[in-house]
């Protein structure tokens, strides 16, 4: 099960009813943060989201409405008692920006691992942390993070998160591979173990792969040819909808953003299950006023609001 909370749905500048861009994902008690605009900390407190268990922070690009909440958040995480490493993923330039932030944060009790312009990252989700791993054909990860270069006025990344579902234990397979019973539980947890000089792997006791959960996130950008394939069959697609009306198309083109309808068209092409719009222009008082026109293109579309949640479950 994956819990998703929109912490901030505004673009450009914070508004009384909308903080700036941020989303938090919670999987098995471990958290991933997508962007960190102003107000992120406040929204996390309002929504009861803990700070200490944030393991990965994904930044789309380096415009202020997506990163200005980060220095304060990193400080608060340090004050929460966290000592485990945190991964920060972002576009070219993210390392320099973070190093600048660290001038004001010289005593963080944890290490920041900055992954610049990276893709196809594999992670294991453990009870105490999420950990980057190098895989081989015998061990599968719990989480894959893929990135896609977008079309914005600053280097910008879209993100796709694929959460694998644990395979069922296969007794016949374990017996066929002559795996000692005392190792079964460890192998079911995807651990590599040895006994009497013999190595045993999880594939020796587990059945076929089952359908996992996919969440995709793209902001800020114009529509591109690569986005539909990147978001294909996502259970949830969170996408910018900076402008609600097609009358603002000239602004969308000039500022390299999207209208609601353009986002809906991407969702339709990508065959996603649900489109959740975010990153609304300060000129939009009520995004829901513009939803119906976009629903002519893609029906299962909603205008997100701060604090809105989704729960994505594994399905057989």
From Swiss-Prot:
Enzyme Commission code: 3.1.26.11
Positions bound to Zn(2+) 1: 61, 63, 152, 220
Cofactor: Zn(2+)
Keyword Heme in annotation: no
Gene3D superfamilies: Ribonuclease Z/Hydroxyacylglutathione hydrolase-like
Catalytic activity: Endonucleolytic cleavage of RNA, removing extra 3' nucleotides from tRNA precursor, generating 3' termini of tRNAs. A 3'-hydroxy group is left at the tRNA terminus and a 5'-phosphoryl group is left at the trailer molecule
Protein residues bound to Zn(2+) 2: 65-66, 220, 279
Keywords (A to Z) from UniProt: Endonuclease, Hydrolase, Metal-binding, Nuclease, tRNA processing, Zinc
InterPro entries assigned: Metallo-B-lactamas, RibonucZ/Hydroxyglut_hydro, RNase_Z/BN
Catalytic-site annotation from UniProt: 65
GO MF annotation list: 3'-tRNA processing endoribonuclease activity; zinc ion binding
Short name of one Pfam family: Lactamase_B_2
Keyword Amino-acid biosynthesis assigned: no
Cofactor binding note of this UniProt entry: Binds 2 Zn(2+) ions.
Function: Zinc phosphodiesterase, which displays some tRNA 3'-processing endonuclease activity. Probably involved in tRNA maturation, by removing a 3'-trailer from precursor tRNA.
Subunit (UniProt): Homodimer.
Similarity section: Belongs to the RNase Z family.
Name of the molecule in the record: Ribonuclease Z
The organism of origin for this protein: Clostridium perfringens (strain 13 / Type A)
Lineage: Bacteria, Bacillati, Bacillota, Clostridia, Eubacteriales
């Amino acid at each position: 099960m994956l819990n998703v909370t929109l912490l901030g749905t505004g673009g450009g500048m914070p508004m009384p009813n909308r903080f700036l861009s941020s989303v938090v994902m919670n999987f098995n008690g471990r958290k991933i943060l997508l962007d960190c605009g102003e107000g992120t900390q406040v929204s996390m407190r309002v929504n009861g989201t803990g700070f200490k268990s944030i393991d990965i922070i994904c930044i789309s690009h380096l415009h202020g409405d997506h990163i200005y909440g980060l220095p304060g958040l990193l400080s608060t995480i340090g004050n929460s008692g966290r000592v485990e490493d945190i991964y920060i993923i972002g576009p070219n330039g993210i390392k320099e920006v973070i190093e600048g932030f660290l001038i004001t944060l010289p005593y963080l009790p944890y290490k920041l691992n900055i992954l610049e312009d990276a893709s196809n990252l594999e992670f294991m989700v453990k009870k105490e942390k999420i950990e980057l791993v190098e895989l081989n054909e015998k061990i599968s990860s719990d989480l894959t993070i893929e990135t896609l270069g977008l079309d914005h006025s600053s280097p910008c990344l879209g993100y796709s998160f694929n959460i694998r579902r644990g395979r069922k234990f296969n007794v016949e397979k374990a017996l066929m591979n002559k795996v000692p019973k005392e190792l079964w539980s460890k192998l079911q947890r995807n651990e590599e173990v040895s006994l009497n000089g013999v190595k045993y792997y999880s594939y020796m006791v587990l059945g076929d792969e089952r359908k996992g959960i996919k969440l995709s996130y793209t902001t800020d950008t114009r529509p591109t040819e690569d986005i539909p394939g990147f978001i294909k069959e996502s259970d949830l697609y969170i996408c910018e909808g900076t402008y609600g009306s097609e009358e603002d198309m000239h602004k969308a083109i000039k500022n390299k953003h999207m209208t609601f309808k353009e986002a809906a068209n991407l969702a339709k092409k990508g065959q996603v299950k649900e489109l959740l719009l975010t990153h609304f222009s300060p000129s939009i008082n009520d995004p829901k006023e513009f939803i119906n026109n976009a629903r002519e293109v893609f029906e299962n579309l909603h205008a997100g609001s701060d604090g809105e949640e989704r729960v994505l479950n594994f399905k057989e």
